[in-house]
């Protein structure tokens, strides 16, 4: 199942560089832009995967941060490297960095995917 995410930017404003539809490794993503009453609308059809950047995941579904805290994000914050590390990590990179076992990885991905898909479907 594919999901659609819409974001609107004021006229003349450029979307942030580190955005899901700009920087994401697009295995099944397509980017469209159009004009809507003077504002630029960016549409991306995205599918959840372990290659999703953490910043995209947290922007789209902020509730995911609480779950990530239980799996090691708290340690990154405590070490004071959150602002440096998180913008550079994908979910797969986070799992590797935290050295999660396969069972933990499957639980984490399942929980995050459920929240992410609910958020994109309007739930």
Curated annotation (Swiss-Prot):
InterPro entries xref list: ScdA-like_N_sf (IPR038062)
Entry superkingdom: Bacteria
Identification of the protein by name: Uncharacterized protein aq_900
Organism of derivation: Aquifex aeolicus (strain VF5)
